[in-house]
């Protein structure tokens, strides 16, 4: 699980940032959901993290990290 996007955008060129944010907002369900993931009110699934990393890779950004992450442990 992960949340927070400041680190994602720290090395992004100014002309790429609006497009990347817009595509992320669309994927995550709009402005409200984007900011919930950004502020940790919701956690990104591994699938969502992979999608975002692929999106950034399409714009030639490969070394990206989310602000926070944690592993969920399954206790049986």
Q: What kind of region is each of these model predictions?
A:
Residues 1-22, 62-66:
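A short, Lys/Arg-rich alpha-helix, primarily the initiator
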Residues 29-45:
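Recognition helix of helix-turn-helix/homeodomain-like DNA-binding domains
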Residues 41-42, 59, 73:
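The DNA-recognition helices of helix-turn-helix-type DNA-binding domains
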Residues 66-76:
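Short, charged recognition helix plus adjacent turn
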């Amino acid at each position: 699980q992960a949340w927070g996007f400041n680190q994602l955008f720290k090395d992004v060129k100014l002309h790429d940032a609006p497009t990347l944010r817009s595509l992320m907002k669309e994927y995550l369900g709009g402005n409200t959901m984007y900011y919930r993931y950004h502020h940790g009110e919701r956690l990104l699934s591994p699938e969502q993290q992979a999608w975002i990393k692929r999106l950034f890779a399409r714009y030639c950004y490969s070394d990206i990290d989310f602000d926070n992450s944690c592993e969920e442990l399954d206790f049986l």
